[in-house]
Amino acid sequence: MAINSTNLENDKFGYACYTIVAPAPDALAAPLLDIEHAAGQERAKIPGHVTVKGTFYDIESLDGLLSAIRSVAGQHQPIELGTSGMDIWESEHSVILGFKVNPEIQALHDDLMSNIGPLGNSAYPDDPYRSHMSIVNEVQPEGVATARSMINDLDLGESLRFETIDLMARDGVAWGGTWKRLERFELGIA
């Protein structure tokens, strides 16, 4: 059952919710942050990334979660995600890039779902998996227009390479809280 994670309160580990992402390549970090600032992004947002396992909450063991992610990450090699056929998902308040799901990122997602899914509750259905990069989230309509025009100048190349995944956790509610990286996991390193 889907819930609105916006106002979840911090758990016994000090975080309201968690997600697993592949951080954007370094060359995109600054341009993506520039877009967020220009569009007026105020809601807590993770810096440029592709979501690999969607938002979840109510975990029983942070150490158990870290161990499970480490194990899964070690079993998967770095991923190339093609930009051909990419869609722009736009709403009144958000701009999201949708990528075609390839077998490698789907397998990583599926393994995370199998191993991480039972350790907490998903805020929304993760399947079917939709590989995406949120550019701005819950901004004013003029912010959407700004972000939309700026992504036209963004050079994503033919593919994005991901060599790591991050466990991110939100400290506090969405408006006023902050996302923090709890740990980075190298893909293919057991």
Functional labels for PLM-detected ranges:
Residues M1-E80, F99-T164, G176-A190:
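Basic, often amphipathic N-terminal segments
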Residues E92-F99:
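Surface-exposed, active-site-proximal loop segments in enzymatic domains
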Residues S84-E92, S131, T164-A174:
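Short proline/glycine- and acidic-rich turn/helix-capping motifs at secondary-structure junctions
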